[in-house]
Amino acid sequence: MSNKNKKSGGAGNGAAQKQTRQQSHDSQDYSSFKIVLFYCMLIVFLPVVTFFLLKGFVLDRFFSLSEVKVNIASAVGAVVSLHIALGLYIYRAYFGATGSKAVKED
């Protein structure tokens, strides 16, 4: 009878540990999701914003360039900003995740 009491007492403790571990994994997953979402938004919107800022505010107002040259320069600026955003994402993915190691669970 004492074995049953020990097993039932340990099962409750194991369930609490499992729940705590699950909450920890959920927290890590949410943190990873926020990071990936941030970089996705950066990769999508930074080039668009860069293109229109360069075209509308910088190149048209301060330089006397033709419309085609303004569009080309704005597109080049957008491509450069895209490469910067991708480089930041790759750097973060490669070097930034040193603290979270994959742990095998049985």
UniProtKB/Swiss-Prot annotation:
GO cellular-component term (any): endoplasmic reticulum membrane
Subcellular location(s) of the protein: Endoplasmic reticulum membrane; Endoplasmic reticulum-Golgi intermediate compartment membrane; Cytoplasmic vesicle, COPII-coated vesicle membrane
Residues in the Cytoplasmic compartment per record: 1-32, 91-106
Keywords: Cytoplasmic vesicle, Endoplasmic reticulum, Membrane, Transmembrane, Transmembrane helix
Region (Disordered): 1-26
Membrane side Lumenal: residue ranges: 54-69
GO biological process, one term: vacuolar proton-transporting V-type ATPase complex assembly
Membrane topology field: Multi-pass membrane protein
Presence of keyword 4Fe-4S: no
Similarity comment: family membership: Belongs to the VMA21 family.
Function summary: Required for the assembly of the V0 complex of the vacuolar ATPase (V-ATPase) in the endoplasmic reticulum.
Record-given protein name: Vacuolar ATPase assembly integral membrane protein VMA21 homolog
